[in-house]
Amino acid sequence: MEKFINDDFLLESKYAQELYHNYAENQPLIDFHCHLDPAEISQDKHWDNITQVWLGGDHYKWRTMRSNGIEEKYITGDASDREKFQKFAETMPMLLRNPMYHWCHLELARFFGIDDVLLSGDTAEEVWNRANEVLKTLSAKECMLRSNVEAVCTTDDPTSDLQYHKEIASSDFKVKVRPTFRPDKAFAIEDHLSYIKYLEKLEKAADIEIRSYDDLLVALKRRHDFFHENGCRVSDYGVETIWHKKAFNYEIEDTFQKAISSSEKIAPEEAAAFKDAVLRECAAMDCDKGWVRQLHIGPLRNNNKVMFEALGADAGFDSIGESNYAKALSKHLNNLNSAGKLGKTIIYNIHPKDNEMIAAMLGNFQSSDFAGKIQLGSAWWFMDNLDGMRRQLEAVSNLSLLGRFVGMLTDSRSFLSYTRHEYFRRLLCNILGDEMQRGLLPKDTALVGQVVANIAYNNPKAYFNL
């Protein structure tokens, strides 16, 4: 059988092949948004078998197994690692046309040298044995070095002491590992008990009693300063929508007091006004320090109550939300811009219908401060597939500047997911190569190739100042 993952995988023209092999393939990776555990990097985690590195914590794979009718004990339960791997392998043939099929075979090829068999129930034993042999010498740091990673930005709560980032920074590990300030829990006022528990952690980290809304802002500012001192230059906010709810300071204070001292339910409009206020305050902090601010907009989380109670969050029970936030986004950006507090911003939407809306909106707020200052982020989560990436690239190309795009990221908890950069680069080169062949772009490989190199490496390196 011809190798599925070959040198020209996804590259359907000679121009695509030239672009990829000459301008993209060997570029270092700037993975500016991921969910890797910095402790696992610092401690150079090793794995006993492929199930641990491949299936542990990967809710993408878990969802596919559930869709294939696999019992939960083989997914997150007490089945053996070998049994779990077998069940995932049996699911693989059902995944044709799902990006997981491509991702998995790219990972098998790049990290384990397995490119001569396709994973299935029948080949599971062979792949298990071959992969586990390689894992004897493969570690977290080795995965990063082998993938030519230059820098990563993890995702960290403001209460983190950043111990492991400090350890990595003081070591001889050549990959930059920077924290990202992600204060989502400071917004989550609807759940009184959880919010109060979180504020207790924030109080301890910031060394302040939080008894008012102003105290909350002081605490966040102290942690923001601490993160900056430890190399952080990026923030991230996971929000269900963008809010624009005008409220007086005393109303925000009343809502905060209700959150920390009352069992009275907070009304949706009160929560929206509070979240809008905190988001704007944090945006101002980001701008003052010259950080890049990221907004991830739109997921509908924890849909399955039974499974949420059994497994908690981030277990594969989130989906695409839907809201109309064009006007709110306009007002949000305009208010920050008018106050001189709109810094570099990347907006990721989970619903593909919002691609053009956001891309067009961002053109209203560009600046000579930095070319491509405000960006539509790469296709995210459920859109992280060939079709979703293509649609996102079309929106950027048609309504913004493709040549200023900062490119791809993994958004992953897995040390094997760096092949997603390769996947994106191959698609980008295939799109541009196809248009060169059809005469829609100049047949000038150097011209188009420079755009490819910029998106793959130069643009994110400059944008994030890494």
Please report, for each region that a protein language model flagged, where it lies by residue:
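C-terminal amphipathic alpha-helical interaction region
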Residues: 293-295
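Hard-cation-handling environments
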Residues: 299, 304
